[in-house]
Amino acid sequence: MANQQYYGTGRRKTSAARVFMTPGNGNITVNGRPLDEYFGRETGRMIVRQALEQVDAGDKFDIKATVSGGGSSGQAGAVRHGIARALANYDAELKAPLRRAGFITRDARMVERKKIGLHKARRATQFSKR
């Protein structure tokens, strides 16, 4: 039997992740480090595992992900997006429940740019009537 491998690209904010999924026992590696070591906060680890738990595939696959750009929250979202796409490549019937949960859709929200004359994207100097 050939070594089956499923691929998915995930993006979130300014992060991009390449996810390779092979049949295994649930080991998740991000940039060559174990998931628990790479994402220090529990929320990041939970976000990464969400797509697998949605389709009860938590211990069926080994996952290797390389992610770059952005911060920890964006990287976790990018890995989740990549895992969801890889699961859809593995079995087309999983696409519907993953889409209903919102894991297939690319979250298009980005940081709003700072405008000149303002402190931040929308924060202006304090206004005084008199």
Curated annotation (Swiss-Prot):
Disulfide links within the chain: none
Keywords of this entry: Ribonucleoprotein, Ribosomal protein
Highest taxon, organism lineage: Bacteria
SUPFAM superfamilies: Ribosomal protein S5 domain 2-like
Family: Belongs to the universal ribosomal protein uS9 family.
NCBIfam families registered for this protein in UniProt: PRK00132.1
Name by which UniProt lists this protein: Small ribosomal subunit protein uS9
Source organism of the structure: Halorhodospira halophila (strain DSM 244 / SL1) (Ectothiorhodospira halophila (strain DSM 244 / SL1))
Gene (UniProt): rpsI
